[in-house]
């Protein structure tokens, strides 16, 4: 089973989401990720991967792998802020202490 940790930035983004249905879809997706099923996801380079959520405006979760089974959820966003969110995730990852 995978362990998902959250940055403060990710936690704040998720907490501020007003779309209750989308929030439920995201929580369901994160639950599946703990079981190893990341679904529609791809590596973006620089150690950052993107999990695409097919709900609302196309939500995205940016994460990195830490060790065998630990994943750190870096940043969340949607399609309209994708380029900025990817850069934020990469910058945040660089600023975090190594494993």
Q: Residue locations for each model-derived region?
A:
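Solvent-exposed, charged helical/coil patches
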Residues: 1-31
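Enriched for short, Lys/Arg-rich terminal
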Residues: 3-4, 12, 23, 38, ...
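Amphipathic alpha-helical interaction segments
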Residues: 18-21, 46, 70-71
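Secondary-structure transition/hinge residues
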Residues: 18, 34, 97-99
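A short, surface-exposed loop/turn module that caps and links secondary-structure elements
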Residues: 27-55
């Amino acid at each position: 089973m995978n362990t998902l940790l959250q940055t403060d930035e990710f936690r704040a983004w998720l907490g501020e989401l007003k779309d209750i249905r989308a929030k439920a879809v995201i929580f369901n997706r994160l639950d599946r990720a703990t079981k190893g099923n990341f679904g529609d996801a791809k590596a973006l380079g620089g150690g950052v991967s993107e999990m695409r959520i097919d709900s609302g405006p196309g939500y995205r979760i940016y994460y990195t792998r830490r060790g065998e089974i630990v994943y750190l959820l870096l940043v969340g966003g949607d399609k309209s802020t994708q380029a900025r969110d990817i850069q934020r995730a990469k910058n945040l990852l660089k600023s975090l202490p190594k494993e």
